Amino acid sequence: MSTKFVEVGELKEGSYVVIDGEPCRVVEIEKSKTGKHGSAKARIVAVGMFDGGKRTLSLPVDAQIEVPIIEKFTAQILSISGDIIQLMDMRDYKTIEVPMKYVEDEAKGRLAPGSEVEVWQILDRYKIVRVK
């Protein structure tokens, strides 16, 4: 699991965070200053990258939050059998199996053996983002 920690105040919409062990994309962030002696708070709304679940989190802006390190690479589709897509990593030619549920909707109709796809590796899981 490759992650790093950043301050909540540095997050923006479109950033990625780890909430409850699930990598999520931030879709909304609200920062509010509380009273005279209180610290500012941030309310984060994020959507899970693998399960699509909506998660809400409220933290002080100076708190540390876990951010996944996303590794992007190109792979070639070797075969599609049922709900499993077998890929070959074009960097080191190792074989990877990705479930069909981890494929972006706009890429699903264009998958074919021999075509190249962009793959994101997030927290030791793989997601097919687009067909090249």
Swiss-Prot record:
GO terms for cellular component: cytoplasm. Keywords: Cytoplasm, Hypusine, Initiation factor, Protein biosynthesis. It is found in: Cytoplasm. The modification Hypusine is found at K36. GO terms for biological process: positive regulation of translational elongation; positive regulation of translational termination. It comes from the Archaea. InterPro entries: IF5A-like, IF5A-like_N, NA-bd_OB-fold, Rib_uL2_dom2, Trans_elong_IF5A_hypusine_site, Transl_elong_IF5A_arc, Transl_elong_IF5A_C, Translation_prot_SH3-like_sf. One of its GO terms (molecular function) is translation elongation factor activity. PANTHER family: TRANSLATION INITIATION FACTOR 5A FAMILY MEMBER. Functions by promoting the formation of the first peptide bond. Belongs to the eIF-5A family. This is Translation initiation factor 5A. It comes from Pyrobaculum arsenaticum (strain DSM 13514 / JCM 11321 / PZ6). The gene is eIF5A.
